Amino acid sequence: VTGANGNLGSATLAALRARGVAATGGSRMPGAGMRRLDFDDPTSLDLTEVSTLVLVSAGYAEDDQVVGRHAAVLDAAVRDGVRHVVYTSLTTAGDHLGFALAHRATERLVQAGGLPWTILRNGLYAELFGGLLRWSGSGVESPFGDGALAAVARADLADAAALVAADPARHSGRVHDLVGTPITAGQVADRLGVPHRTIGLGEYRRRLLEETPGLLSFQPPMLASIATGIRHGFLDGTTPDLTDLLGRPARDPLATAVAAASATRPKTSA
């Protein structure tokens, strides 16, 4: 499992081990029992004795760097005898998002690489949705308006990846679109017991550029595209793929988003 120190990678690794699957993680800064896998250092990409590779997207960069990283890992997988690749991609409904092209380009690489493959088109996290609400005075603000997001709890996506990786042949050549139940910013605010105020997309872009320190150059357009997609109803479609794969109901994305928003609540607003 690549990206094993990240949120999705670590949860996927834990889910595999909970199922009794012999699994190891790879990371640029590996913990105990992990392999060093630095996507920017091809000499570190040792995948010998790996039967199934769960390639967690290395999306925290510009598109060309992301695709280059993924290509290097996939080349190593072919070289070292990996027998199946599972790639965590982006939901089909996200084709218009600012970071979609790196995912679709990687899907092409996966499908053309000569190894059996499965693609998991993951919906946007409920944790992300809740975390993007901004506390202001006695309530929350967002650029989402009344638009809904078919959000997914990260833990469900980790469980889905573990299920596929534990029995990859069953899912060979398949693309699973893993989205959840549509939720709105207003619903999150209601659960929190506070009002929700919509801000314009132009104001949101201005805040990203002028009032949000620490963002890298690719992040403002990425976040703005998410806001536009949610606001105008491009990310609210759902499919049964997630629950069919899990064999159980999905975790409540609204409760997950509420918990994420609550975690950023200023003490003075409590």
State the predicted function of each range.
Residues 8, 30-34:
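Short, charged/polar "capping" segments at the starts of alpha-helices
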Residues 35-51:
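Conserved Rossmann-fold cofactor-binding substructure of NAD(P)-dependent oxidoreductases
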Residues 246-270:
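Amphipathic terminal alpha-helices
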Residues 189-233, 269-270:
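Terminal hydrophobic/aromatic helix or amphipathic segment near a protein terminus
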Residues 235-244:
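Short helix/strand-capping connector loops at secondary-structure junctions
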Residues 23-31:
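Short, polar loop motifs at secondary-structure junctions
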Residues 2-24, 40, 51, 58-68, ...:
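Oxidoreductase cofactor-interface core, primarily capturing Rossmann-like NAD(P)-dependent enzymes
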